[in-house]
Amino acid sequence: MKKHGVLNSEIAAVLASLGHTDTIVIADCGLPIPDGVKRIDLAVEIGKPSFLDVLQVVADDMAIEKVTLAEEVINNNAEIKKEIELKLIEPVFEYVCHEQFKEHTKKAKAIIRTGEATPYANVILHAGVIF
């Protein structure tokens, strides 16, 4: 049994398989998940698990080079934006419109669905390298 890091076997497998620039998405419970993209559904009820809890665990176990957010988060969920920036201080941040964000999710290796129910609580994490 693992002692630390991501314990969810599906998430751990996806993280282990990522190459440089591959992407994964951590999403609120409302983001549409495109056909053909691996869905890892953690949502058990509204708010559980939270977006920020899942982001923290994944970020602790992943080399992240870049972060993509919907620009709408700036005016519609400033608290989540602030918390993301506090948790992810090293990567480059990119902002795109929500429709473009949803297009980008089609290329993700996986989308991790949380129970989060606040607007635009979604992030695309671009894998970096550990060397």
Swiss-Prot record:
Q: Residues that bind substrate, according to the entry?
A: D28, H98, Y120, A121, N122
For this chain's UniProt record, which GO biological process terms are given? D-ribose catabolic process
Could you say which EC number(s) this protein's record lists?
5.4.99.62
TM stretches of this protein: none
Which top-level enzyme class is recorded in the Swiss-Prot or TrEMBL entry?
Answer: isomerase
Catalysed transformations (reactions)? beta-D-ribopyranose = beta-D-ribofuranose
SS bond list:
none
Fetch the InterPro entries from UniProt.
D-ribose_pyranase (IPR023064), RbsD-like_sf (IPR023750), RbsD_FucU (IPR007721)
Q: Which UniProt keywords apply?
A: Carbohydrate metabolism, Cytoplasm, Isomerase
GO molecular function annotation: D-ribose pyranase activity; intramolecular lyase activity; monosaccharide binding
Q: Active site: which residues?
A: H20 (proton donor)
Say yes or no: keyword ATP-binding present: no
UniProt pathway:
Carbohydrate metabolism; D-ribose degradation; D-ribose 5-phosphate from beta-D-ribopyranose: step 1/2
- One Gene Ontology CC term in the entry: cytosol
Q: What is its main location?
A: cytoplasm
Q: Where in the cell is it found?
A: Cytoplasm
Q: How does it assemble?
A: Homodecamer.
According to its UniProt entry, the function of this protein is described as: Catalyzes the interconversion of beta-pyran and beta-furan forms of D-ribose.
Q: Which family does it belong to?
A: Belongs to the RbsD / FucU family. RbsD subfamily.
Q: Which PANTHER family match?
A: D-RIBOSE PYRANASE
Any idea what this protein is called? Answer: D-ribose pyranase
Native source species: Bacillus cereus (strain ZK / E33L)
